[in-house]
Amino acid sequence: MVAGGDAKLGAKLIGQFQCGACHAIPDIPAAQGRTGPTLAAYGRRSYIAGSIPNYPDALARWIVNPPAMKPGTTMPAMGVSEPEARHMAAFLITLR
């Protein structure tokens, strides 16, 4: 569970920010990207980007500014606010 996060709103925001252009994401129409990793079963993952422990606050911070957490990552900052990121994280954690 993500404090301050609404999974339904998060799914909508993931669509609005076009995360599916790079990621395949279950339950998001047209989210079939192949540039980034699939986000299927994201809620079962132990790590974000292979090295950052996957817990809700870290995931929200990652969504806001990936390069600040893992310099050299190919995932760009997309202009997502912290409240928006909490909603998006709430959705991603539901993917089992």
PLM-predicted stretches and their roles:
Residues 1-15:
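Electrostatic cytochrome c docking/interface patches
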Residues 2-6, 51, 80:
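Extracytoplasmic/periplasmic, Sec-exported soluble proteins
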Residues 2-5, 21, 58, 72:
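Flexible linker/context regions in extracytoplasmic redox proteins
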Residues 7, 11, 24-60:
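Gly/Gly-Pro-rich "capping" loops immediately C-terminal to redox-active cysteine motifs
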Residues 14-17, 70:
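Residue-level signal for short amphipathic helical patches enriched in basic/charged
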Residues 17-18, 46:
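Alpha-helix capping/termination and helix-coil
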Residues 21, 33-38, 42, 62-95:
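Axial heme c-ligation environment in periplasmic c-type cytochrome domains
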